[in-house]
Amino acid sequence: MERISAFFSSIWDTILTKHQEGIYNTICLGVLLGLPLLVIITLLFICCHCCWSPPGKRGQQPEKNKKKKKKKKKKDEEDLWISAQPKLLQMEKRPSLPV
């Protein structure tokens, strides 16, 4: 118990020393001490959101994705068809270079 109180006491002494050195050090300490708190709050929010979200929404998303994939496959099959005729037309339209 003494080690823990000594640890926090040393941190408090460091904070007071840096505060006396200037406002810039106080702002830096505030940011550095606030970042872990922000991370903990964010993780807590994400965990609560995942645990409390309705299970119905999770089950519906893959079904929609399957339908979209099927539609994309059909479109991709149509897009993969290559005709030789347009290439011939393009070559005929290209002007010949004078020699």
Curated annotation (Swiss-Prot):
GO cellular component: membrane
InterPro entries cross-referenced by the UniProt entry: KIAA0040-like (IPR039964)
Region spans: Disordered: 54-81
Superkingdom, natural source: Eukaryota
Composition bias type Basic residues, residue spans: 65-74
Transmembrane segments: 27-47
Lipid metabolism listed as a keyword: no
Keywords (A to Z) from UniProt: Membrane, Transmembrane, Transmembrane helix
Entry membrane topology: Single-pass membrane protein
Localization terms from the record: Membrane
PANTHER family (alphabetical): PTHR40382, RIKEN CDNA 4930523C07 GENE
Name the UniProt record assigns to this protein: Uncharacterized protein KIAA0040
Organism of origin: Homo sapiens
Taxonomic classification: Eukaryota, Metazoa, Chordata, Craniata, Vertebrata
